[in-house]
């Protein structure tokens, strides 16, 4: 918002802020001085009023205390009943005290004006009597409300002494009505009031009777003021009050203070009026200064306004660069006007040069456009022919790639056949080796079977021996049995053994016969196996011969396939070289075509730039023509 203000308005705003700040500081400083002055005057006034009122209270109480002392001194000299009655009835005492009385050491009580006392009343037990005797001199009681008159009273008492002995205590009841009137007469021009307070904070006399006998902490619960010299502040019913305490000196047995309470708002009311007056005066002064300053700024800014109108005429009017400002002073505005004239003169020369350059630029742009159009046509023709060559080379490359692909397929199939022939040859060779090994193993088996047949013959011979031994054993066992039978009972055990031996021999003979039968069968099988092995060996040799002939044929086929594969690889290699050459030509043609396209695009960009240049040249010519040079 400040940026949109005029320069004169900014100056006026800044000046108003300075003036306002100056008046504000002056008002605050004056307010500070006035506050201090009012506070000092108020403190001096309260101190003086407190001292005067305290002195008046002291004098008022002192005169009455003096009457009590004089009465005690008179009674000390003569305390006969007649003297006591006459003395207590003196007008000076009856007009001053509500009651004057004497309590004697023997319990006799005399009071004037006379008033009936309760039965058994003993003055020696009363506080005023005890306090006076204990103090040994003049005493004052705390204020209390009289039961008969409902007035606030105090008692002044002093002992009656003769020859160092206490004869009794004389006292007088004082109404505080006069003292209340003295204190209540202080209204401080309606700003406050005074009240009497004891040293322990109990209020003794107060304009508001409801506050009497209350403590300061009860009246001011939030921030209770301390009873001391000086000034303090406290809140009462939502208002701040200034409190000052002045001690009442010369009072026996009691400590009393005169408290002065002032409403702070009323005490500083003059300061509030001064603030209002100062603010009003400051506002009036500021308005007057701003009006005068506005007129002065308007007068001083006149040359600047003329310069602004001239610049607006150049910027928004006919653009007359032949106009100059009239410089009539050598101040800042004169220097600014002279600089403006120099600037316009320089712009004038520059615009004339720009006008000539704009015409030349238009002609040059026309020549560039014509040349670019011609180059564009040639580039189109070159692009068409390049595309034709590229298409032919692409067809040649496709044919070469087809030949190379077919040659590669043939070479691949020949390689597969060669590999398969090699595999077959290896299989045949493995078969020949296996059949040779089989023939050798058959021959070995025939030899083993022949050896086995020979050993079975040997086993038959051994079995014949075993059979002979079994027969002999059987005969021996039979003979042994016969001999045992002859021996009778003595040969029974031997007969059993012989019989068992004969059984074993018989069983051995049967087993030998079975083995003989099995060996004969084994010999028959061995002879048949030898015949079969011999026939298998003959067939195996024939198979080996046939496999050798098949291996030789496969070797011949493998050599022929290898030759065909070599030819196919040569054709594929030549075709791949031809394809690489075709691809290289194709890439070159493509690069040429790309470069040609880029050239066409550059020519088109040049044409667009030339068109834009021609447009800008026309615009520049229009702008130059808008100035009057």
Curated annotation (Swiss-Prot):
Residue ranges annotated for the HAMP domain, each copy included: 298-352
Location of region: Disordered: 405-424
SMART domains associated with the record: HAMP, MA
Transmembrane spans: 11-31, 277-297
Residues annotated to bind L-isoleucine: 121, 126-128, 144-147, 173
Effect the entry attributes to changing residue 121 to A: 150-fold reduction in AI-2 binding affinity
Membrane-side (Periplasmic) residue stretches: 32-276
Membrane topology, from the record: Multi-pass membrane protein
Gene3D superfamilies (alphabetical): Methyl-accepting chemotaxis protein (1.10.287.950), PAS domain (3.30.450.20)
Compartments it resides in: Cell inner membrane
InterPro entries (alphabetical): Chemotax_Me-accpt_rcpt (IPR004090), dCache_1 (IPR033479), HAMP_dom (IPR003660), MCPsignal_dom (IPR004089), Sensor-like_sf (IPR029151), T_SNARE_dom (IPR000727)
Pfam families registered for this protein in UniProt: dCache_1 (PF02743), HAMP (PF00672), MCPsignal (PF00015)
Deletion phenotype: Mutant is defective in taxis toward 17 amino acids, including Gly, L-Ser, L-Thr and L-Val. Mutant also shows decreased chemotactic responses to TCE, chloroform and methylthiocyanate. Deletion of pctA, pctB and pctC abolishes chemotaxis to 5 mM histamine, but significant chemotaxis is observed at a concentration range between 500 nM and 500 uM. The pctABC-tlpQ deletion mutant is devoid of histamine chemotaxis over the entire concentration range (50 nM to 50 mM). Deletion of the gene significantly reduces chemotaxis to AI-2.
Outcome after substituting residue 111 to A: 120-fold reduction in AI-2 binding affinity
Top-level taxon: Bacteria
Positions annotated to bind L-methionine: 121, 126-128, 144-147, 173
The UniProt record lists the keyword Transmembrane: yes
Keyword annotations from UniProtKB, A to Z: Cell inner membrane, Cell membrane, Chemotaxis, Membrane, Methylation, Transducer, Transmembrane, Transmembrane helix
GO cellular component entries: plasma membrane
Assembly: Monomer in the absence and presence of ligands.
Further comment found in the protein's record: PctA has a broad ligand range and responds to most of the proteinogenic amino acids, whereas PctB and PctC have a much narrower range and show strong ligand preference for L-glutamine and gamma-aminobutyrate, respectively. These receptors are paralogs: pctA gene duplication in the common ancestor of the genus Pseudomonas led to pctC, whereas pctB originated through another, independent pctA duplication.
Summary of the function given for this chain in its UniProt record: Chemotactic-signal transducers respond to changes in the concentration of attractants and repellents in the environment, transduce a signal from the outside to the inside of the cell, and facilitate sensory adaptation through the variation of the level of methylation. Major receptor that responds to all naturally occurring L-amino acids, except L-Gln and L-Asp. Also involved in repellent responses to trichloroethylene (TCE), chloroform and methylthiocyanate. Also mediates chemotaxis to histamine, but does not bind histamine.
Domain notes: The ligand binding region binds directly to 17 L-amino acids.
Family classification: Belongs to the methyl-accepting chemotaxis (MCP) protein family.
Protein name, UniProt field: Methyl-accepting chemotaxis protein PctA
């Amino acid at each position: 918002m400040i940026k949109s203000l005029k320069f004169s308005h900014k100056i006026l705003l800044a000046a108003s802020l300075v003036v306002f700040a100056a008046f504000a500081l002056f008002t605050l400083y004056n307010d500070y001085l006035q506050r201090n002055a009012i506070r000092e005057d108020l403190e001096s006034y309260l101190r003086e009023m407190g001292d005067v009122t305290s002195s008046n209270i002291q004098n008022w109480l002192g005169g009455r205390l003096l009457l009590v002392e004089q009465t005690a001194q008179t009674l000390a000299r003569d305390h006969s009943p007649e003297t006591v009655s006459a003395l207590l009835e003196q007008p000076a005492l009856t007009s001053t005290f509500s009651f004057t009385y004497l309590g004697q050491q023997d319990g006799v009580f005399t009071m004037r004006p006379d008033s009936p006392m309760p039965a058994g009343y003993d003055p020696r037990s009363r506080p005023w009597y005890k306090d006076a005797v204990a103090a040994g001199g003049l005493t004052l009681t705390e204020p209390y409300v009289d039961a008969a008159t409902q007035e606030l009273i105090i008692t002044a008492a002093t002992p009656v002494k003769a020859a160092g002995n206490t004869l009794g205590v004389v006292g007088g009841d004082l109404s505080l009505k006069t003292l209340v009137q003295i204190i209540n007469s202080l209204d401080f021009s309606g700003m406050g009031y005074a009240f009497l307070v004891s040293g322990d904070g109990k209020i003794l006399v107060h304009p508001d009777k409801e506050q009497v006998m209350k403590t300061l902490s009860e009246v001011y619960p939030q921030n209770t003021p301390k009873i001391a010299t000086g000034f303090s502040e406290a809140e009462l019913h939502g208002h701040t009050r200034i409190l000052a305490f002045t001690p009442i000196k010369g009072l026996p047995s009691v400590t009393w203070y005169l408290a002065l309470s002032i409403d702070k708002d009323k005490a500083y009311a003059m300061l509030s009026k001064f603030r209002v007056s100062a603010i009003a005066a400051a506002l009036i002064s500021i308005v007057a200064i701003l009006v005068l300053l506005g007129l002065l700024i308007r007068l001083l800014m006149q040359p600047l306004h003329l310069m602004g109108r001239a610049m607006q005429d150049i910027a928004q009017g006919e653009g007359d660069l032949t106009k100059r400002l009239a410089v009539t002073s050598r101040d800042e505005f004169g220097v600014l006007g002279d600089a403006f004239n120099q600037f316009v003169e320089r712009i004038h020369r520059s615009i004339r040069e720009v006008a000539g350059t704009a015409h030349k630029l238009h002609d040059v742009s026309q020549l560039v456009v014509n040349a670019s159009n011609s180059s564009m046509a040639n580039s189109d023709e070159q692009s068409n022919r390049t595309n034709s060559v590229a298409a032919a080379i692409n067809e040649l490359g496709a044919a070469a790639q087809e030949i190379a692909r077919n040659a590669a397929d043939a070479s691949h199939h020949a390689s597969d056949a060669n590999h398969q022939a090699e595999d077959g040859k290896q299989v045949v060779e493995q078969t020949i080796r296996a059949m040779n090994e089989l023939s050798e193993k058959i021959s070995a088996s025939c030899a083993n079977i022949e050896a086995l047949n020979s050993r079975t013959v040997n086993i038959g011979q051994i079995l014949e021996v075993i059979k002979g031994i079994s027969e002999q054993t059987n005969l021996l066992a039979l003979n042994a049995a016969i001999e045992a039978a002859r021996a009778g009972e003595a040969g029974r055990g031997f007969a059993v053994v012989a019989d068992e031996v004969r059984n074993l021999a018989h069983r051995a003979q049967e087993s030998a016969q079975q083995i003989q039968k099995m060996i004969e069968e084994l010999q028959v099988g061995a002879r048949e196996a030898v015949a079969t092995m011999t026939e298998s060996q003959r067939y195996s040799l024939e198979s080996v011969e046939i496999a050798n002939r098949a291996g030789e044929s496969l070797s011949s086929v493998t050599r022929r396939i290898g030759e065909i594969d070599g030819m196919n690889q040569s054709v594929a290699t030549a075709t791949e070289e031809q394809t690489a050459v075709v691809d290289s030509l194709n890439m070159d043609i493509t690069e040429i075509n790309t470069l040609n396209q880029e050239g066409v695009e550059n020519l088109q960009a040049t044409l667009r730039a030339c068109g834009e240049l021609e447009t800008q040249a026309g615009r520049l010519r229009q702008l130059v023509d808008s100035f009057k040079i």
